């Protein structure tokens, strides 16, 4: 469940700690709306704070 961060929870909190939303996890995740409801997050890497990492999935 590495690429299930935003997609799995629907919010995408874990990469950023922006109020529990986490837009911008690695390289431009926020640009695609990683915290807008589970869209594509560019190429986030498994380095989130909550433990939900995105391995460059979209």
Swiss-Prot record:
Q: Does the keyword Repeat apply?
A: yes
Instruction: Quote the cellular component terms of the Gene Ontology held in the record.
Output: cytosol; intermediate filament
Transmembrane segments annotated in the record for this chain: none
Q: Do the record's keywords include Repeat?
A: yes
Q: Which UniProt keywords apply?
A: Keratin, Repeat
Write down the superkingdom of origin.
Eukaryota
**What family is this protein classified in?**
Belongs to the KRTAP type 19 family.
Self-association and partners: Interacts with hair keratins.
Q: What does this protein do?
A: In the hair cortex, hair keratin intermediate filaments are embedded in an interfilamentous matrix, consisting of hair keratin-associated proteins (KRTAP), which are essential for the formation of a rigid and resistant hair shaft through their extensive disulfide bond cross-linking with abundant cysteine residues of hair keratins. The matrix proteins include the high-sulfur and high-glycine-tyrosine keratins.
The protein's name: Keratin-associated protein 19-6
């Amino acid at each position: 469940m590495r690429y299930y961060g935003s997609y799995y929870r629907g919010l995408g909190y874990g990469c950023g700690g922006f109020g529990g939303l986490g837009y911008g996890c690695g390289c431009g995740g926020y640009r695609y709306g990683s915290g807008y409801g589970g869209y594509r997050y560019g190429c986030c890497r498994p380095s989130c704070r909550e433990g939900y990492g995105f391995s460059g999935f979209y």
